Amino acid sequence: MMDPAAGSGPDGAAVVPPELPALPVAAEDPMALYRQVLRDFKELFFCLEPMEITRYVHRNEGRCLSLGPPKGWHVMLRTEDGIITAAKQAASKLICCREPLTPLGYAVILLPEPRRDHHDGMVATPYVVFMGRFSRVYAYDTREKYMVLVSHNLDELARYGVSRSEIAYRDVIHTTLRRMTVPVPRRYPKGARTMHVLFLNDTTPEGSYATAERILGCDVKLHTPGYGTVIMRLMKTVQQLHRIWPFCALTEVESRRWWWAVRANLATPWYVLGVTGRPRPGRSFVAEVLVLLDWFGAVYAIQMDDPNHYVRRVANTITEFFRMGLLKMVFRHRRFERERQRQTRMEHRHLCPHHHERAVDHKRDILFNEDAALPDERRERERRILQQQYDWLCLTERFDPHEGAWERLDPNTLVLHRYDTNSQSYVLDPDIVGVEAAEREAAGHQDDTGPRLHCLVTTRSSTREGAERVITALVHQSRLVTYSDPFPLKSLTGVREYIQI
């Protein structure tokens, strides 16, 4: 990946990027990042035409604008080069409607001051950032050739930044961050138990693993950024699934039909990782999402209350899955890519973000009186309306510094939102989903010592060396290890397509 800080200006002269801005310290005002985004994008917010955005980028080339949380994410303004031009052409083909996409530059991650040196003050990413109508922000991945909708408007960008986008949790980004910064050990609450989830087969010679906070037994916490924490019960076999609801209600014929459909969709040997849901005292565990892995380590989920029971990808690797949880299921329909690629990866189909714009444009024509007003007067009136909207976004009383946005202060809105992307708030009550009750029960079992390692491995390896590599490394703590072998792939005929379960 090229260095976005280097390059030439519009006149061929070398561009010297300005000094990188200092990142705020962690203990400062929690609303500082929100206000920083509003300040950085103020001039872009008032741009009425794509050409105005382009001129702004030319004037401020090399400047970094904050993209909100997670802290450190910025867009470095750059005029069009070969990579940006190619990304713009590809993104224009992926967008569902004829929306003008104006490139802003490359997404970068600025490192905190103590971790910077003289040469590596930032981490370059493969994402090109675009701005559409009504301050919509998109990011195009130049490696995997897809685009995500980062935010629908400036308010959403300032509140949530890129935390709702899968691009913030990719392994390639976090691997680079670990290489360029001093490793910081992940901190768990005092006395917390941990569970290591290991994935190892012929496709991953070195293996990969993730660490989760264990509650009790094989129950771990799965956190989805911007949504909340749910209980995930790790499973080893389909027989274990038959002990929980609704799988315990399936007949033998229905069970075979279920697993046949999973095989037909994944088209590889596959593993059961577990289910998310809630325990019920004296009754079966209620499964809400079934989580699977294919032979290559990609993670898929099946939403149990969806009558179609589609198999959908939620992460490329197990490490990404425990980093972002069910983010792609909660904030879904934001990924734009070629249809063949979407079907191959089994991604959610995007939803058009423009379906309300026709009505909005009609109201704008009425508001600005296009037929009667002169063009200059119309633009002046439009800028005046935008100024009023921007002033409203900057009102400090809209937020509580400890609770966040105002909807969290209204008791009438403290409800459980599940996979509702139309809502601006996602309040996940830990008591409703059973996390608090499970933690209280775990507190009474301080003597619980295992299991500590959940393995998704091929114990029946085709080579003796492979079997010894897996078994020997873990045999000394076999009492604390659970295994999950892959389900074999039976030969299937016909075209691979989505098969309803």
Swiss-Prot record:
It comes from the Viruses. Transmembrane segments: none annotated. The keyword Coiled coil does not apply. Disulfide bonds: none annotated. One of its GO terms (cellular component) is viral tegument. Keywords: Virion, Virion tegument. It is found in: Virion tegument. It holds the Pfam family US22. Belongs to the herpesviridae US22 family. This is Tegument protein US24. It comes from Human cytomegalovirus (strain Merlin) (HHV-5). The gene is US24.
